[in-house]
């Protein structure tokens, strides 16, 4: 347990930031899941919008320091490959 005033404050700040980061990650995972579901259904009209949403959420997570930029780049690349495969099929 923290003894100093600043350490006690940091415990509160860390708890708050952790909650915000969990919300951001959850929102991003949901966007990715929605995109994958649309790809599986074969809906070519909505797949572009879903991809933009997922990509935007991933970039926001990178900018806020929630996930590493290489992780986001890898996920975006793999999702983009799936979208392209659907569009050409």
Curated annotation (Swiss-Prot):
The keyword RNA-binding is assigned to this record: yes
Biological process terms in GO annotation: translation
InterPro entries: Ribosomal_bS20, Ribosomal_bS20_sf
Primary role: Binds directly to 16S ribosomal RNA.
KW rRNA-binding (keyword) present: yes
Phylogenetic classification of the source organism: Bacteria, Pseudomonadati, Pseudomonadota, Alphaproteobacteria, Rickettsiales
UniProt-listed PANTHER family: 30S RIBOSOMAL PROTEIN S20, SMALL RIBOSOMAL SUBUNIT PROTEIN BS20C
Official protein name in the record: Small ribosomal subunit protein bS20
Gene3D superfamilies attached to this UniProt entry: Ribosomal protein S20
A Pfam family that the UniProt record links to this protein: Ribosomal_S20p
Domain of life: Bacteria
Key words, A-Z: Ribonucleoprotein, Ribosomal protein, RNA-binding, rRNA-binding
NCBIfam families the UniProt entry points to: S20
Gene that this polypeptide is encoded by: rpsT
Protein family (similarity comment): Belongs to the bacterial ribosomal protein bS20 family.
Record GO terms (molecular function): small ribosomal subunit rRNA binding; structural constituent of ribosome
GO terms for cellular component: cytosol; small ribosomal subunit
């Amino acid at each position: 347990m923290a003894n100093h005033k600043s350490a006690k404050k940091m415990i509160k700040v860390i708890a708050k930031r952790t909650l915000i980061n969990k919300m951001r990650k959850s929102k991003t995972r949901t966007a990715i899941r929605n995109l994958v579901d649309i790809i599986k259904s074969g809906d070519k009209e909505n797949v572009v919008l879903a991809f933009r949403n997922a990509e935007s959420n991933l970039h926001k997570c990178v900018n806020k320091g929630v996930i590493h930029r290489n992780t986001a780049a890898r996920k975006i690349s793999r999702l983009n490959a799936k979208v392209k495969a659907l569009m050409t099929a």
